[in-house]
Amino acid sequence: MDKKEKNRQHIDLSDPKTPMEYLRLFLTGFAMGASDIVPGVSGGTMAFILGVYETLINAIKSFNVDAIRLAINFKIKELLEHVSFKFLVALGLGLLTAVVLLAGFLSDTMEDPHGKIFLFAFFFGLVLASIITVGAKVKWSIITALSFVIGAVVAFVIVNVVPTEGEHTPLILFVSGMIAITAMILPGISGSFMLLIMGQYDYILTSVSERDLPPIITVGLGAVVGIILFSRVLSYLLARFYDITVAVLVGFMAGSLWKIYPWKECLADDLDRHGDFRCLAEQNILPDASTDFALAIGLLIIGFLLVNFLDHLQSNENPVFRHIWKRN
């Protein structure tokens, strides 16, 4: 087995059978949903970290002409197997559960200065570790290194775009759903932040919290169309240009670190549609030595070690844990 195939090995959960496999997929979906709520953090990063990224992309890609033909002929059993139905349902239920349960809590946490620092510190540790663990699976060369740099620059530019306040027409909501879901399945580029840039984040989060169905359904339809279209492109790239594609995705994650750096200072603000202040421009600053700083660093370290621990459970070749813990 060559290095590339060894690096790409992962536990196949496309057809879960045991309760533990279903639970793992549900919790993976929950982690993805929780991540996607936070502007600057990507659910795609969580999928990468937890080893289901390629399986997810291929499962979404399976909604094709063959799936339509099976549906028309009422071959339900074959259809459900073809589209990895059990995998998608378990993952999707976890994701939706996180969105419904955590939308209000994470929204409140993001509005609290201390809570935002702690939340971003934890996710900073997660993303930093994922750069190391996923990057270790790439066969590095001049081409892949250049791909990494391009990905990092693109992500850095995107996360530094100043958010706007947009209209909320059905067409705009539909397109926003398409763009956001595309970002969500790209590690490092946050779907929530794309909604923030387009001026839709507060509106959609409020709609979810208040169970306002029309805008939720419109955004959801856009997301379905967007993810079906983009998954085909990404699946092709992973199959044909695996190392280059993963290097770009790792670059996306690296470029996003600027956005989720925990300690920031607001340079310019404005009132949102609720009359609350919203920061339009900010800069990263050095933290003050305090109890909050110590707790934030602790959460950062926990996030960092958690990702490396989960990666080692899957591959036994984690660059951090493999020297201190060799599993049988």
Model feature map: region roles:
Residues 2-37, 45-186, 190-328:
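Multi-pass membrane proteins that catalyze or facilitate reactions on polyprenyl-/lipid-phosphate substrates
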